[in-house]
Curated annotation (Swiss-Prot):
This is N-alpha-acetyltransferase 50. It is found in: Cytoplasm; Nucleus. Optimum pH is 7.5-8.0. Component of the N-terminal acetyltransferase E (NatE) complex at least composed of NAA10, NAA15 and NAA50. Interacts with NAA10. Interacts with NAA15. Predominantly interacts with NAA15 in the N-terminal acetyltransferase A complex (NatA complex); the interactions reduce the acetylation activity of the NatA complex. Component of the N-terminal acetyltransferase E (NatE)/HYPK complex at least composed of NAA10, NAA15, NAA50 and HYPK. Within the complex interacts with NAA15. Its capacity to interact with the NatA complex is reduced by HYPK. Interacts with NAA35. Belongs to the acetyltransferase family. GNAT subfamily. Changing F27A: Abolishes N-alpha-acetyltransferase activity. Changing Y124F: Strongly decreased N-alpha-acetyltransferase activity. Impaired sister chromatid cohesion during mitosis. The active site is at Y73, H112.
Length: 169
């Protein structure tokens, strides 16, 4: 598809219904109104993906402070089936990875993936994510209900925390 354009755009109150519709089609789970209200607050951590000006996918993340770490949680990252394998998911994930890299304070990025979603697991593994645990009955009303937790550890940029050693002079 030479000449096709993939662009990321902001999620706004004017296009939140597009995001809602995409998520209904892409994911086997439904998201409540609080999810969409929160998405409007995260700025660059939520993006719609456009293929030749058509909204075909989205990524939605949040900052999560847990386990004494600053973590980025990918709540959703998905693309309509006819537009998969065109680099759209890669563009969305790279956007998120770049935010974490520029910020420099994230310990890791993580997400949940249904255990049967092999293509998603393979996709994230290409970017250095690893399965760190499996949660039984994570999903309600879908089968299989179990989810893998995939995580990518982020290194602290060199130079940061380098001069922390105390010396007694």
């Amino acid at each position: 598809m030479k000449g096709s354009r993939i662009e990321l755009g902001d999620v706004t109150p004017h296009n939140i219904k597009q995001l809602k519709r995409l998520n209904q089609v892409i994911f086997p789970v439904s998201y409540n109104d609080k999810f969409y209200k929160d998405v409007l607050e995260v700025g660059e951590l939520a993006k719609l993906a456009y293929f030749n000006d058509i909204a075909v996918g989205a990524v939605c993340c949040r900052v999560d402070h847990s386990q004494n770490q600053k973590r980025l949680y990918i709540m959703t990252l998905g693309c309509l089936a006819p537009y998969r394998r065109l680099g759209i998911g890669t563009k969305m994930l790279n956007h998120v990875l770049n935010i974490c890299e520029k910020d420099g304070t994230f310990d890791n990025i993580y997400l949940h993936v249904q255990i049967s979603n092999e293509s998603a697991i393979d996709f994230y593994r290409k970017f250095g994510f690893e399965i760190i645990e499996t949660k039984k009955n994570y999903y309600k009303r879908i089968e299989p209900a179990d989810a893998h937790v995939l995580q990518k550890n982020l290194k602290v940029p060199s130079g940061q925390n380098a001069d922390v050693q105390k010396t007694d002079n």
